[in-house]
């Protein structure tokens, strides 16, 4: 990280942080989370994109607080999925919760590429209406609908779409930047 920051002096570095699980699948106590985030910030991390696999903000609050204390930016990452309890309203509430703990942007992440374009667009529009921060949309091409979903979420107001250059795109990756 220090080597990257020495070379990328003007480029903000962002990491994906699994809340209380940090970089793995084991939950850590608050003091370990605080020290990890503090050290990452000291070594050059600028933006902490924080999520919990169950969208439980309580598992993100400690990391967010530590990042803000270190003077760094926090972005909230909502795990977008489909189930009876994962509704537009639940995603809106999660977005509000992230903003309440200091997030300056909200990401909707469909890691499986399985959310249909209409549902994704309705969710983006509702989140945009509910929070006054940029809304990012992130998906993979696994399900075959991501390019049209990106079209619909862009029309619904998404501020940022995650893409890759064509050599690294499609399949289980993101859509190609050139086609979006």
Per-range role (PLM):
Residues 169-180:
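C-terminal helical cap(s) of enzyme catalytic domains, especially alpha/beta-barrels
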Residues 161-170:
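Short acidic/histidine-rich active-site segments
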């Amino acid at each position: 990280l220090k080597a990257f920051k020495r070379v990328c002096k003007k480029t903000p570095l962002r990491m994906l942080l699994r809340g209380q699980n940090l970089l793995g699948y084991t939950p850590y106590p608050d003091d370990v989370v605080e020290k990890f985030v503090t050290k990452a910030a000291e070594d050059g991390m600028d933006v902490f994109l924080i999520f919990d696999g169950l969208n439980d903000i309580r598992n993100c609050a400690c990391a967010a607080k530590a990042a803000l204390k270190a003077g760094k930016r926090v972005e909230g990452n909502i795990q977008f999925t489909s189930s009876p309890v994962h509704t537009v309203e639940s995603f809106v509430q999660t977005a509000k919760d992230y903003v309440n703990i200091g997030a300056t942007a909200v990401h909707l992440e469909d890691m499986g590429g399985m959310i249909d374009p209409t549902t994704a667009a309705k969710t983006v529009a509702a989140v945009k209406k509910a929070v006054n921060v940029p809304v990012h949309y992130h998906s993979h091409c696994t399900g075959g609908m991501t390019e049209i979903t990106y079209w619909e979420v862009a029309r619904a107001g998404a501020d940022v779409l995650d893409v890759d250059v064509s050599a690294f795109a499609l399949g289980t990756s993101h859509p190609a930047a050139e086609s979006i």
